[in-house]
Amino acid sequence: MEQKHRSEFPEKELWDLTALYQDREDFLRAIEKAREDINQFSRDYKGNLHTFEDFEKAFAELEQIYIQMSHIGNYAFMPQTTDYSNDEFANIAQAGMEFETDASVALTFFDDALVVADEEVLDRLGELPHLTAAIRQAKIKKAHYLGADVEKALTNLGEVFYSPQDIYTKMRAGDFEMADFEAHGKTYKNSFVTYENFYQNHEDAEVREKSFRSFSEGLRKHQNTAAAAYLAQVKSEKLLADMKGYDSVFEYLLAEQEVDRVMFDRQIDLIMKDFAPVAQRYLKHVAKVNGLEKMTFADWKLDLDSALNPEVTIDDAYDLVMKSVEPLGQEYCQEVARYQEERWVDFAANSGKDSGGYAADPYRVHPYVLMSWTGRLSDVYTLIHEIGHSGQFIFSDNHQSYFNAHMSTYYVEAPSTFNELLLSDYLENQSNDPRQKRFALAHRLTDTYFHNFITHLLEAAFQRKVYTLIEEGETFGASKLNSIMKEVLTDFWGDAIEIDDDAALTWMRQAHYYMGLYSYTYSAGLVISTAGYLHLKNSETGAEDWLNLLKSGGSKTPLESAMIIGADISTDKPLRDTIQFLSDTVDQIIAYSAELGE
C-alpha cells in the first residue's frame, strides 16, 4: 500500500486552517502583534505586581495574550504534522517555536511574581472562579520555585528540552523505512502508518506475520538513535526534579496532574494483576475461533471475526459518529455536525505525515483533528476518540476562562474514550444477530480497552521501570530497553502470546515517552469514562452530568471532577468496577460464540 503525496488528495479530506489564519503572512503578522502586546504588558507590569488588585488586572490582560499564543502555537505546529517533508511548513513551525520561546521568556516575570506573592494574595485570587486552576498550579510551583534567574534560564532552554521528542517525531515520520514484504507470491509496500493502521490486524496470517517482521526490521535500524533520544529525555526530567527539590522524578512528573504516586502505582499494579487474566482469556478465545494453535505478537490485534470488518467511507464514519453521540443530546450533536461541514479533520494518509492522531485546541476558534484514514472500522474509533477530545475543548472553552479550560492530564483521555464506548454501544444495539453483537463487543475491547488499558498501560509499566533505573543512578541503551519491554509484555500476557525479540521493540512505536507520565492516564481516563458510560446507562441525569464534567474543564481537581458523575477515584472501586465490566464483556463474547457454535 504505497502512500500518495498530499497534493493527490481531494480538498474535502484536508482540514481548513483559515479559521485561524489565512496564510503564512497572516500568521507572521499575528506573531508581530503578539510580540507588541507582550512587550507592552512587560512595560506595564514588570516590577509592579504586589497586591491582589495588581494581579487581578494583569490576569485579565494576560489572558488575551495567552489566547493569541494558543492560536499561534497551534497554527505553527499543525501544518508540519501533515507533511514533514514540506519546507514551508517547517519554516512556519520554526517561526512559531522561536516566538513561543521568546514569549515564554518575556513573561516569566509574571510567573515569578505570582509564585512569590503572599499566601493571602494567592488565596484571594484563588477565590475568583475564572482563576481557580491557575492559582492551584501556582501554589504547586511555589513549593519548588528556584528563583527568577534560574527559572528564566530553564525557560530559555525550553527548545533544548523539547529536542528529544522532536528528534523522535521526525525520525518516526521521515526515517522509519519498512522494506516491502511478500505474502502468497504478492509483494506489499509497508510503512509505519500502513502497518499500524492496516496490516497489524489483517485477516491473513501470512500478511500479518510478514508485515510485522518488515516493520520490526525497520524499527531495529534506528533503535540506538531512539534509545539515545529517550535517555536524553529522562535524564533531563530527572535533572529538573532534583533541581526543584522533588523526592523523585515520579513526584515531579505527577505534580501538575494533581494526583499522587499511590494513584499512579495502583493504576499499573491492579491492571497488571487483575486485568491481565481477563485479556489473556479473551485472546485465547480469539485464537480458538480463528483456528490458531499459538498466537504471536503479530496476531494480537487480530479481529475476532475478520469477515465482519467492513470497509468504511469517511461519510459513513461521520454518520456513525452522529448516531453514536445522540444520547448526549442536541447541545453536543450540533457541535459534532460542524466537523464535516467546516472541514475540521485532516484525513489524508499522505507520505511524510505524522503517523498518530491528535486533537488541537486553538482556544475559542474551534478544534482540529489529525488522523490518517485507511477505511477500517478502527479509523471510526480514532475519529470519534479525537472528537471526544475536541468536543471537550469546545465545551470547556465556551464555559471556562483560558486559565481554567484545560483538564488535568490525569483524566484528559476520559472524554475521548467515553465517545468510543458510545460507538460500541450503538453498534451493539443495531442488530439482534449474535454475530453482530459479538462483533460490537469485540471492538469495544480491542479498539477502546486494549489500546488504552493494555497498549498504553504497558507503556506506563515500562516507563516506571525506566524511571526507576534513572532514580537509582543507572543508564540504558537499546538492548536494556528491549529487555525491559520484553519483560513487561511477558508478565502481562503470560502464555497467551509468544513474545519474541521483535515484540521487544514496541517501546519505539509511541511518542508518549516524551510527555512525562502520560501513558498511564489513558487507562485512568478510561476508568472515569467507563464510570460515566455506566452512569449514562443507569441514570436519568447521566447525559447532563457528563456534559457538566466536560464544561468544568480544569476548574476542579481530578477527584472533584470525577465526583460530578459519582466516581470516587480516591478509592480503587471505579477501577475494579471497570475490570469487572470488562470481564463481563468477555463472558458475553464467549457466550455469543457458543451460541454460534464456535
Where are the model-predicted features located?
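A well-structured
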Residues: M1-S306, Y318, Y592-E598
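C-terminal, non-catalytic "cap/extension" segments appended to globular domains
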Residues: E8-E11, Q22, F110, L114-V115, ...
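Active-site recognition of the HExxH zinc-binding catalytic motif
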Residues: G245, T374-I394, S416, L421, ...
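Long, K/E/R/D-enriched contiguous segments that form extended
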Residues: K288-P327, C333, Q392, F439-L441, ...
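Catalytic zinc-binding patch centered on the HExxH motif and its immediate surroundings
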Residues: A307-V312, V345-V365
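Short pre-active-site segment immediately N-terminal to the catalytic Zn-binding motif
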Residues: N309-I314, P362-I384
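Conserved helix-loop functional segments at active or binding sites
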Residues: K323-Q334, A360, H389, F393-S401, ...
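Post-HExxH zinc-binding segment in Zn-dependent metallohydrolases
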Residues: M407-Q436, L445-D447, H451, G525
